[in-house]
């Protein structure tokens, strides 16, 4: 996407295809607030100031299995470094649906670990208090296991926090989080180290 108008058009298109705010935010790698702003702006309603956000388009990586493989190797290298520093191991790599899945499955293979899939609650337009995401039963279990969480982008950190809390409630031990891009700029979330290939820091 080259400009705001492209983002607005894509947000409207995704909404017309039935995606809700959280799913659109995940697809465009922006916050829910930015999606709301884009959709409001598309209707030419009262102009609100643009949220401070950055859109990340990593489709040139995502469309190539070869590129995904090499990126997953780089993420594995960072995770192994973190595990060595913290004297921890990995039993399960947890991919956050949907964009964390391809990287997580390749990383699990490389690390000789099981693969688990996490469905976040952010895909729902209205999230009720106490509502949680889920670990898919079709993949590896996490109870009592050392886990590495993999996603594409950290925007606010809320999804990462959700996954960490859910894993802990299930008796798992989150040991590290690996992402392509960290827009939050955090070293840790809930005492779990964050490792990213790219960290974005706003100077305003």
Curated annotation (Swiss-Prot):
GO molecular function annotation: DNA binding; orotate phosphoribosyltransferase activity
Tell me one GO biological process term: UMP biosynthetic process
Against Pfam families, the record matches this protein to: Pribosyltran
* Keyword DNA-binding appears in the UniProt entry: yes
Record comment regarding domains: Contains an N-terminal DNA-binding winged helix-turn-helix domain and a C-terminal regulatory domain (or effector binding domain) resembling phosphoribosyltransferase (PRT) domain.
Q: Which NCBIfam families does this one have?
A: PRK02277.1 (NF002620)
List the protein's name. Transcriptional regulator GfcR 1
Q: Which organism is it from?
A: Methanosarcina barkeri (strain Fusaro / DSM 804)
Gene name of the record: gfcR1
